UniProtKB/Swiss-Prot annotation:
Protein name: Large ribosomal subunit protein uL30
SUPFAM superfamilies: Ribosomal protein L30p/L7e (SSF55129)
Subunit details: Part of the 50S ribosomal subunit.
Originating species: Desulfurococcus amylolyticus (strain DSM 18924 / JCM 16383 / VKM B-2413 / 1221n)
Pfam families: Ribosomal_L30
Keywords annotated in UniProt: Ribonucleoprotein, Ribosomal protein
GO CC field: cytosolic large ribosomal subunit
Domain of life from the UniProt record: Archaea
Molecular-function annotations in GO: RNA binding; structural constituent of ribosome
Length: 162
């Protein structure tokens, strides 16, 4: 199993230094509440996360949350919703028949989401969390805030934002 990081931009563009904004652009996090998924061992990812740690939160996403994310917010090129039929048609030669199989292939490392951008959009546009954030959006997660690394607790936040 490959560890997948779900990276979520929490803070907006105002007063963001140019180097941080450039790194967020490289991560495809152009706007607030956008989420991307990358393999944890992606070269250079740790350094990029260290640079933008005061604007994003990230952690390991699990399979049930990944499936819910694709069903609720997954889009294909042209803004088409991702359905089991669409996945079965596009990934027929890989033997993937539904969204659960697609999520499993991502978690096993057979497919890499950011390299499938002509088939599946790599950015998920989420709502603000229902019930609001638990802490300050300007403090690190370990100091009762929302920013930085949060491990498995990213799944709870994503489910509140679907």
């Amino acid at each position: 199993m490959v560890k997948l990081y779900a990276i979520l931009r929490i803070r907006g563009q105002s007063d963001t230094p140019p180097d941080v904004e450039y790194t967020l652009k490289l991560l495809r996090l152009h706007k607030k509440y956008h989420l991307v998924i990358y393999p944890a061992e992606q070269p250079g990812l740790e350094g990029m996360l260290e640079k933008v740690k005061d604007w994003v939160t990230w952690g390991e996403i699990n399979k049930p949350t990944l499936v819910k994310l694709f069903k609720a917010r997954g889009r294909a090129s042209g803004g088409i919703r991702i359905t089991d039929e669409y996945i079965a048609k596009v990934f027929a030669e890989q033997g993937i028949k539904d969204i659960e199989g697609f999520a499993e292939a991502l978690l096993e490392g057979k497919l890499v989401l950011h390299k499938l951008e002509n088939i599946v959009k790599p950015v998920f546009r989420l709502h603000p969390p229902r019930g609001g954030f638990d802490g300050s959006s300007k403090k690190p997660f370990n100091m009762k805030g929302e920013l930085g690394y949060r491990g498995e607790k990213i799944n709870e936040l994503i489910e509140r934002m679907l």
